[in-house]
Every structure is written in structure tokens, then in C-alpha cells.
């Protein structure tokens, strides 16, 4: 029997928790949809090497480890009819050697255009 690949650890920054709490008021299924995204899309991308063109590494940062990624294809059931093009964005750090991801930021593209680079730099530089 084969086991399903997962990450050894999934952590959340306090700022991420605040983002999630705020967005969860508008998008009721967000917590559950986030868990599904981590178990499927992120595991496929990092653990099994399958790219669905929904996860992109953020470039132009002054460090390489951890690698910082943005998820653009994020299906949210609360946004009916939009599928993976919901407009939600997830920023996370991937610590390859530790088999760990750390959730940095989540936002709705209609509210904010790009990731908070200052947050990324203050936590990982």
C-alpha cells in the first residue's frame, strides 16, 4: 500500500492568519478550499513534480532559500462559476530540505494587485 505524499510541516505566519480571517468572512469556504489546495496542487507541484501552470516562483528576491511561490490558480467554492480563476492569490515559502511550507500571505486580486514584498523580506531575508 502506498502512502499519499504530504509535507512534513505546514506553518502559517501570524500575518497570514489575519489575512485569512478577514477573507474568510467574505468567502465562507476559504479554509476548506485552502486545505484542499495544499493537499492537491502544492503536493503535486513540489512532491510529485507535476505543474498545472498555477504555481509560480517569485523572482527578484535577494535570497534563494526558502523559495517563495505564488499560487494563481486557486479554486474557491464561495466564488461560484469562477473555478480556479477565482482571483485569490496565495504566497508561501517552500523549505525543500525540511519538506515544509510556510503560508505567508493570502489576498483577493480585486482588493490588491501584488504580493507584499516587504512582508516577504522581513520574514526571510
Per-segment meaning from a language model:
Residues 1-45:
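Arg/Lys-rich, positively charged N-terminal/basic patches that mediate binding to nucleic acids
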Residues 34-41, 52, 56, 109:
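Residue-level signal for alpha-helical context at structural boundaries
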Residues 42, 46, 96-99:
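Short alpha-helix boundary/capping elements
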Residues 43-80:
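A short, surface-exposed loop/turn module that caps and links secondary-structure elements
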Residues 12, 30, 34, 67, ...:
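Amphipathic alpha-helical interface surfaces
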Residues 10, 68-69, 101:
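A broad, low-specificity signal marking well-ordered, structured residues that form hydrophobic/aromatic
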Residues 2-7, 75-125:
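Enriched for short, Lys/Arg-rich terminal
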